[in-house]
A protein has these predicted regions:
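Extracytoplasmic
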Residues: 1-156
């Protein structure tokens, strides 16, 4: 059975492009004695949900089968320059305006053959304004104010 987690995303702006990242951790971050089976890569399906300008609920698949690399932090780019039709900034919501659903997408055969795991190790979700982040093989960097100051996270 595949697993699902839903993140409620607050305070998004309309017509502003976001780069949407899912950050996953390796099994070794949780257990330094993780077995080879526990250290298998994940295969995930990611869907964004939001309300349109008429208030109707919409769903859009961002990724149908994105995979992680075992034994390292993964910064998975789910969408680039993604724009929402309506802002939810400052709303107190009984029903979230924006959701991100992450689901394992591993077949029984893939699990039986030990190709992928259904265990999710999610560190965080990041909605980064488009154009201020840079992802390379060894680091993820954000320059938030365009003033030369930058923040980065090493990937390995």
């Amino acid at each position: 059975m595949n697993h699902t987690v839903v993140f409620n995303i607050r305070d998004v702006l309309s017509n502003i492009g976001y780069d949407i990242y899912l950050v996953t951790a390796p099994a070794l971050a949780n257990d330094s004695n993780a077995t080879n089976i526990q250290r298998l890569p994940m295969k995930l399906k990611c869907t964004i949900g939001f309300h349109d300008q008429e208030g109707n609920s919409q769903q859009e698949e961002l990724q149908s089968a994105i995979t992680t690399t075992p034994d390292q932090m993964n910064y998975l780019l789910l969408a680039e320059d993604y724009k929402f039709p309506c802002s939810s900034f400052g709303l107190t919501e009984s029903e979230p305006q924006v959701t991100l659903t992450v689901q394992t997408n591993v077949s029984s055969t893939e699990q039986r053959n030990r190709t992928f795991t259904r265990t999710m190790l999610i560190d965080c979700v990041m909605f980064v304004p488009h154009g201020i982040s840079h992802l390379t093989d060894d680091r993820f960097e954000i320059e938030p104010h365009g003033d030369g100051d930058s923040y980065f996270w090493l990937m390995k």
